[in-house]
Amino acid sequence: MALPLLPGFSLGRNVGKEKFHKSQHWGYCNNVAMLLAEDKPGIGGEPLPGQKLIPKSSVFPAELGCGAPAWLAFDKQVLSFDAYFEEEVPDKNQEPYRIRHCKIYFYLEDDTIQVLEPQVKNSGIIQGTIVRRHRIPLPSPNEDQFYTIDHFNINAEVIFYARRYKIIDCDQFTKHFLRKMGFKLNPPGNRPDDPYTKERQKILDSMNPLRPYERIDTLKQFLEHDGHVLRFYCVWDDPESLFHDPRELVLHYYLSDDTIDIKEVIPVNSGRDVVPLFLRRDKLPKYAPTGLYQPGTITSRTVLNVFGNLVGNRGRYILDNRKTGAVHQEFYRDSDLKIGAVINVWGRQIMLCDCDEFTKDYYRTKYGIEDFTPVPYKAPPPPKAEKPIPPYTGFGSEEDSLCSCMSLLPKPPQKDFKKFMEKDRCGLESNTLRFLAKLVTDSPIDKDRKFIICYFLMMPLYSVFEHSQRNTGIIGGKFLEKGRIKKPGQELFKSEPSEYFKAQDLFIGARVCFHGHNFLLVDADEYTINYMEKHANEFAVADTGFIFKKLKDIAEPRSREIRQVFAAADPQHTKVIEYDPFRNLIVSITDGAFSEHEIMTLGRHYGEKEEYEIDHHFLLAKAQEQLKKNSFENFEQLSTILVYNDREKCGALPYETCRTICKSFKLPLSDDLLQTILTMFEDDHKQVNYKKFVDAVNWREHQIPSFHTIKLPPKNEDDWNGQPPFLPVKRIKYLPLLDDLFGKEE
């Protein structure tokens, strides 16, 4: 007995309820008030007492969270069933019924069904779509309902519009989906064969034609060699021409169908008309021309009339396997083409003289031919006549005067824009070479004057500045404005272009003459020396390999004497000597054949490098400061990913793996700082201890007090005052130099 609906004795039935609408049960039909539907629910969509609602579409299990609707969750997902149905064949004793196989597709998004019948050869039935895609109602008396996913299973029958379909199997996706839905699948059924089709197949298999048609299949050759073309360069000596001038041709052999086309190379101003093709693409017969054949003479098959005109006007035609009276033609194949061969192109003798690289690889691979020596078929081109250039007039620059002589309309000279963009100043790269120079003179006043020679790489221009000195009576500043400088000893009015000073003419120890002033280059700034060493292929005085070879050729005959000289310069046996004694020894050994720049390059190569110790504490503090400024706190997730990539669980990962993971996390550290910190935690096997690395940069748990960076004034290269820089190499390790020159002493 149910409890009465008294306050405090009943639960709140409307708790969590959102729908409170009433269904429309009554209405008008032909202006008559009547009950329209008895299956409509009550208030809020809840069923009435004793009412059982039947879902109008398939009901799928609810997913976790907010599930998507069926039309979105099951978009483009289809269940496929293999089925068949029996069809009666009236008035035919040989075929009382027919088995027709079909496919049933159930679309999960909207419960629509489609039935397709695959094509069967010579069936005589219109096949394809039997039932178009739509929702199919159930058979009577439930025609007000539609088929859903619950009505389908293996070895089950469905009725579509009075036609009974037997489902025998389904695909793997359908089986997996139905199992997930909770269906218990039946075992697959047998696929029955159509008796009449089976009988017809037996008859066809028993038939053995005595004269089968010859199979001509070129599909394989087309698929293997489509787009593969052999190219030969040919020549044809036309005997009908007046001067028997050779005609250059290009022959293309198409491997996909063994056809050939030929194009003629028309020289410029030859007087010949340009035609698209010398020979259109087709198979080329070897023995041609042989006359014209009547239509039907050349066919792919030969047919015989067995009875002729004996039986009225009706004949009996069969295939002639012996091909009596057939015309056989031989065509050029790829095996007939080779360099030096002469082929017949419809009566014209054409010689194959050369081929391209693809053709050589093809013949080398297929036929094993290695000799591809081309046949010379044309004389070398005559040397191009040089255009006489008038001498320089003295007005404007030489390039401007030369451009006015090249064409009727004068054009301005073209500048090297690419070099300008590559060598233009970019950030700290000034692309300017600076040298300290002195005047070569006997004047006691001019001897002490110092000049800075600047060479701008973006445009080959020079500028000279004089360094101002106190109590000299000479005002410093610009000595020579920016511009090009000609080498001395050249005529002014001449046809040949003048020679100008280049970057290769400037090095420490060089003597240059700028407009009558002789300069001796005595020093250079650090940027210039580094630039010349970095581009050693352009500057021979900064090429260590070239200098070493030059020194070895001079010093090799006196190896023992040179070892004794260097040993005498190092009485304490420290294996190093100062730069000045080293320079004096090289000058004495080479008898002045080496310039100051070459000696300095050699000293920089074998000099002692000052090693700077890295302050790990300072680097970690800088790294934590950068991470803190960028609010990076995903250290736990970073550690988890590093542990996940550690398959061997050894606590270490390769350097590149750690760097890649840090980059994928967008760790806000500069690349050089990240590489340095990772190197700090490497072991002997180049493995990084990632746990220590994460703990070191974790500013939340292991914070390191920050350092106060001392801001130094930025060094500007343009402020170089010409004073000799701090010598970058003080001590030279001479033993490695001697070992490289003469080998290790035993």
Swiss-Prot record:
Residues 557-592 form the EF-hand domain. One of its GO terms (biological process) is regulation of neuron projection development. Residues 75-182, 226-367, 429-536 form the DM10 domain. InterPro entries: DM10_dom (IPR006602), EF-hand-dom_pair (IPR011992), EFHC1/EFHC2/EFHB (IPR040193). The keyword Cytoplasm applies. PROSITE patterns: DM10. One of its GO terms (cellular component) is axonemal microtubule. Keywords: Cell projection, Cytoplasm, Cytoskeleton, Repeat. Its main location: cytoplasm. It comes from the Eukaryota. The keyword tRNA-binding does not apply. SMART domains: DM10 (SM00676). It is found in: Cytoplasm, Cytoskeleton, Cilium axoneme. Microtubule inner protein (MIP) part of the dynein-decorated doublet microtubules (DMTs) in cilia axoneme, which is required for motile cilia beating. This is EF-hand domain-containing family member C2. It comes from Gallus gallus.
